[in-house]
């Protein structure tokens, strides 16, 4: 049997590889503390689960759902955006529920790119932006994110011959993996740049509700003209501890939303209706869970930053997101340092190069680790310092 070239050329997904390494270590009876994957360990709030249980017993929710989501869910999503960001959305034309935002991100390339087009993709970045673009037959032009520019892309440095073929610009703030944030002035620059060069902007914003020290991230759609040029992907996964329930949204430009809707309707059957109803409970109910989450993650951030500094690493505490982006010691590469930590301490981190070539020299640590495990990891890191 011969597989398609697109599959033959598809690299293994980064986090699948990491999970395999962890499983191998644990199968040998070794203790492993993993800071590798950003999957909240905190439970879904009880009032949200109660709505799911209630909805699951209703036979009307046992049938095929509507691909574009329940009207009442789209309305709840639009109202949440209005309350949170002051952004007004038409729930019928500018809101599309997704089976997790990753699904929409993966589909976007097929909606907005043809073979030979160019996608402008930050580097380092969540791997799906580049992989989905390549699967759709497009070329990827990397936009380096570096500390000197606060991990923001330099749009003016993009060559004209690239811009003439570029169709999509990906951005992501608060950022994964760097933890960087972007203000409204940057989003305004992006909206103006996209309008000038006829680009479709795809902003991935699932970490807007994970922020520290009183910081409040803004939405790309708050920029003037943003809805004319782009959409924003959001997720309930990180905000309400719902990664396992797979529900997110795309909002913004009506033409782009309609393209995603048409694509989805031909490939999937939508989000299970009971999960849509639990999402409504999350969006319409108390938002105190967000404050509670942020307090927990901030405490973890502070402990991890302190421990990394104690072993000689120059770490900046992130203002938002679930990640610490830490430069590795001199004489190490991202991969060699991550490997040494795993071999000598049993602590798993993600090498920065897993997110692109510009991630060289860094590792990423996630805050989605129970406090007890964090303390064990910190003890292991302290032991590493003594032995090195």
From Swiss-Prot:
Its cofactor is pyridoxal 5'-phosphate. Its EC number is 2.6.1.83. The keyword Transferase applies. GO terms for molecular function: L,L-diaminopimelate aminotransferase activity; pyridoxal phosphate binding. It comes from the Bacteria. GO terms for biological process: lysine biosynthetic process via diaminopimelate, diaminopimelate-aminotransferase pathway. The modification N6-(pyridoxal phosphate)lysine is found at residue 238. InterPro entries: Aminotransferase_I/II_large, DAP-NH2Trfase_DapL_Desulfo, DapL/ALD1, LL-DAP_aminotransferase, NHTrfase_class1_PyrdxlP-BS, PyrdxlP-dep_Trfase, PyrdxlP-dep_Trfase_major, PyrdxlP-dep_Trfase_small. It catalyses: (2S,6S)-2,6-diaminopimelate + 2-oxoglutarate = (S)-2,3,4,5-tetrahydrodipicolinate + L-glutamate + H2O + H(+). HAMAP family: DapL_aminotrans_1. Homodimer. This is LL-diaminopimelate aminotransferase. It comes from Dehalococcoides mccartyi (strain CBDB1). The lineage of its organism: Bacteria, Bacillati, Chloroflexota, Dehalococcoidia, Dehalococcoidales.
């Amino acid at each position: 049997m011969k597989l398609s070239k697109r599959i033959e050329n598809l690299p293994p997904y980064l986090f699948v590889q990491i999970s395999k390494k962890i499983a191998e270590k644990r199968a040998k009876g070794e203790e492993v503390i993993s800071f590798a994957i950003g999957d909240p360990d905190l439970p879904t709030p009880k009032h949200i689960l109660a709505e799911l249980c209630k909805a699951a017993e209703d036979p009307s929710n046992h049938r095929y759902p509507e691909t574009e989501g329940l009207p009442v869910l789209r309305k709840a999503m639009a109202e949440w955006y209005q309350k949170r960001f002051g952004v007004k959305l038409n729930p019928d034309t500018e809101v599309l529920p997704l089976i997790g935002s990753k699904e929409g991100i993966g589909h976007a390339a097929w909606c907005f790119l043809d073979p030979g087009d160019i996608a402008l993709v930050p580097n380092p970045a969540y791997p799906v932006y580049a992989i989905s673009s390549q699967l759709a037959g497009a070329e990827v032009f990397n936009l380096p994110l570096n500390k000197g520019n606060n991990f923001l892309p330099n749009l003016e440095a993009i060559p004209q011959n690239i811009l003439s073929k570029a169709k999509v610009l990906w951005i992501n703030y608060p950022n994964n993996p760097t933890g960087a944030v972007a203000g409204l002035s940057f989003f305004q620059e992006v909206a103006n740049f996209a309008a000038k060069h006829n680009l479709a902007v795809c902003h991935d914003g699932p970490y807007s509700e994970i922020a520290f020290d009183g910081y409040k991230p803004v939405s790309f759609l708050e920029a003037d003209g943003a809805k004319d040029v782009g959409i924003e992907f959001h997720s309930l996964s990180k905000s309400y501890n719902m990664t396992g329930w797979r529900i997110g949204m795309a909002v913004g430009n009506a033409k782009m939303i309609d393209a995603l809707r048409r694509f989805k309707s031909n490939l999937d059957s939508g989000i299970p209706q009971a999960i849509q109803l639990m999402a409504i409970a999350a969006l319409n109910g108390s938002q105190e869970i967000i404050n509670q989450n942020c307090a927990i993650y901030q405490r973890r951030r502070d402990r991890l930053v302190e421990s990394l500094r104690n072993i000689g690493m120059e770490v900046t505490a992130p203002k938002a997101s679930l990640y610490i982006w830490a430069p590795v010691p001199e004489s190490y590469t991202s991969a060699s340092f991550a490997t040494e930590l795993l071999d000598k301490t049993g602590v798993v981190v993600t090498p920065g190069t897993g997110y692109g070539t510009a991630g060289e020299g860094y590792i990423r640590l996630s805050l989605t680790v129970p406090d007890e495990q964090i303390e064990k990891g910190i003890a292991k890191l302290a032991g590493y310092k003594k032995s090195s």
